[in-house]
């Protein structure tokens, strides 16, 4: 079996000509059993490419633009630690050894693979469309999660305010994985604070409790954790027990009962930000949360 090697670099360049012509391309699904086996063995994460995403050329065979469906965003972090969300990324597949590196999708992710030709090392460059450079000047950025606002989940629920509005447990639509930096995204942080404010100010006429502000590893005895979706990512939220009962939500009373499991790659450790318990994906490409 010919080994497939992945090397993924997510980067930001400087300038891409605004006059480039764009033609939609059909990115083929990866079907080779050898390639799929190597993806699973290496834990390669690829680039999120959920259903409804589009790939278009950027005036050069070396560059492809991925456009996510409406209301879906990449959350990225640059070298300076700045976190933001974008709906498009520029992608370039490049063969470093040999020839024949080609793009393909598998399990909702975009890869550059050595499935064809004699390429033994494929490299994926991904960056902000507005700043890709035809000269190759680049600045690295990391994908720290995906935001999905298409359904009535955490973000929409927080804006309306009230646990009675949240639907019973729903599976996340995108399981790419998130890290602690995901919570530094302005839109994620604001939604989380709006949620907590709605719960405590609306129902109890109180400010957000100190145990949340201090990111305590324990919750008060009158609170529980409920499973919810944070922009399409599975998390457990601290919630007053009486509200969870009123809404008919499944409850977990102890963080030790929440588990994170990695089946491909490494990482997927239990973590928390503002007492939101989540699985920190790290380099795991298949990170799942359970109780």
Which stretches of residues belong to each language-model region?
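Bacterial Sec-dependent N-terminal signal peptides
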Residues: 1-31
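Surface-exposed charge patches in extracellular/virion surface proteins
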Residues: 3, 160, 201, 264, ...
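Aromatic-enriched hydrophobic runs in primary sequence
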Residues: 5, 83-85, 275
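Prokaryotic Sec-type signal peptides and long signal-anchor helices
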Residues: 10-11, 53, 215, 264
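N-terminal propeptides/leader regions of secreted preproproteins
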Residues: 19-94, 127-257
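Secreted, short cysteine-rich peptides and small extracellular cysteine-rich domains stabilized by multiple disulfide
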Residues: 90-128, 255-291
């Amino acid at each position: 079996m010919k080994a497939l090697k992945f090397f993924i670099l997510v980067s930001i360049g400087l300038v891409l000509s605004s006059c480039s012509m764009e033609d939609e391309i059909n990115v083929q699904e990866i079907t080779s059993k050898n390639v799929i086996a190597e993806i699973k063995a290496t834990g390669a994460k690829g680039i999120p490419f959920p259903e409804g995403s589009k790939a278009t050329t950027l005036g050069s065979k070396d560059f492809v633009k991925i456009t996510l469906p409406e209301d879906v965003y990449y959350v990225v972090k640059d070298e300076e630690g700045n976190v933001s969300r974008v709906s498009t990324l520029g992608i370039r597949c490049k063969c470093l050894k040999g020839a024949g590196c080609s793009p393909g999708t598998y399990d909702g992710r975009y890869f550059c693979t050595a499935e064809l030709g004699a390429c033994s090392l494929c490299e994926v460059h991904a960056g902000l469309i507005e700043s890709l450079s035809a000269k190759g000047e680049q600045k690295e950025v990391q994908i720290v999660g995906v935001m999905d606002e298409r359904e009535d989940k955490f973000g929409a629920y927080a804006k309306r305010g009230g646990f009675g509005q949240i639907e019973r447990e729903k599976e996340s639509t995108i399981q790419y994985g998130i890290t602690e930096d995901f919570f530094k995204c302005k839109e994620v942080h604001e939604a989380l604070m709006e949620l907590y404010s709605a719960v405590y100010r609306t129902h109890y006429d109180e400010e957000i409790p100190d145990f949340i502000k201090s990111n305590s590893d324990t919750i008060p005895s009158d609170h529980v954790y409920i499973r919810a979706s944070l922009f399409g990512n599975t998390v457990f939220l601290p919630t007053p027990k009486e509200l969870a009962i009123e809404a008919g939500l499944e409850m977990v009373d102890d963080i030790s009962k929440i588990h994170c499991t990695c089946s491909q790659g490494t990482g997927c450790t239990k973590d928390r930000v503002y007492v939101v318990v989540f699985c920190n994906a790290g380099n795991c490409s298949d990170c799942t949360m359970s109780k």
